[in-house]
Amino acid sequence: MKKYQQLAEQLREQIASGIWQPGDRLPSLRDQVALSGMSFMTVSHAYQLLESQGYIIARPQSGYYVAPQAIKMPKATVIPVTRDEAVDINTYIFDMLQASRDPSVVPFASAFPDPRLFPLQQLNRSLAQVSKTATAMSVIENLPPGNVELRQAIARRYALQGITISPDEIVITAGALEALNLSLQAVTEPGDWVIVENPCFYGALQALERLRLKALSVATDIKEGIDLQALELALQEYPVKAYWLMTNSQNPLGFTLTPQKKVRLVALLNQYNVTLIEDDVYSELYFGREKPLPAKAWDRHDGVLHCSSFSKCLVPGFRIGWVAAGKHARKIQRLQLMSTLSTSSPMQLALVDYLSTRRYDAHLRRLRRQLAERKQRAWQALLRYLPAEVKIHHNDSGYFLWLELPEPLDAGELSLVALTHHISIAPGNMFSTGENWSRFFRFNTAWQWGEREEQAVKQLGKLIQERL
């Protein structure tokens, strides 16, 4: 442990033991130099670390003070993704998926949008059409990197945002999760360090365990996203190889990074030679006028692997995703050949047929409008029926709300009780191996709203009220 970490740990222990109370002023940097015998730079780094972890706050012209509620946000710590921890996460995920298959359960825990939102009849017609005209060569033509017309169509979508990506850089995959996993394999070896958000998409934690990678969690703000100061401290301390990050409509929190933050993020990762694996599956589900740019838009050094899919915005059942892989494209193709061999040829051809009709953008406009309306309606119902002590964190994109229960309530326990009433919610610890998010849960707003959903929220409010 480095000297500044030792000092930070000492001060954390003093705060935890009550030596320093919330609101107390800490010794100034110069006084701490005299007290500790350490250099000014070491003391400064220690204070910066404590500030990034939420233990202390800096006040201009006044100094450093113990935070009112240390610690609000998760600190930058190692998450050892051990088998036991992964089993706990997998249990939550298994229970959630099982519940989503039961039509009697109101699926507020689901990760998927309502399938009735998608143009399934048109897509099925496209699938039937290509099945009639497919030849024996179709399978060969659609081997990695995938159907050339589909890759060209995806490249044109990038071009609409001013991002130049050659179809040759794009690899078609079996959904975004395969794109993300292959990207991770392409830039890491077992034992390497990978940064993940906290909380993060649970598939990231499962992937790290499977590939025997070490996870590093960095503080993430519910509204603003990644703490860049905490990120830089982590990059200084650990030999990080990759960063798995959602930049737009993050799951489960829902935030979208600002363009300024994306620029700084790409520059910082480039400085430390860290590859960004950008998970951008929700990018089409924005509610504003313009689609938010991915971090890939500012990639000038081929340091961003941009992964997305059609699963959340067009057709979940087809399992078609892609990665804009740049210089890693050939390696990812080889890795894909050794695992899944290729992505479904009929599904690729059906998507090419559908995209050629120019109906896609009209569908997306309709989808965004419906999701925004459903999110607003769900939010209003939650405000009506849930106790005032419950905080609802709302973002203007996607279809998730992030709810915060008051202490000492536990979302995991609430989710189990709710299931007995045929209501599912996704507890926060699904998205982290620690206990930082045990009072939080994710709420899916994408399903058609009716009397059943209204009564389910009302019942959820009663269950929470009983535990206050």
Q: What are the residue ranges of the model-derived segments?
A:
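Conserved glycine-rich beta-strand-loop-beta hairpin in the small C-terminal domain of fold type I
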Residues: R369-W379, V390-E404
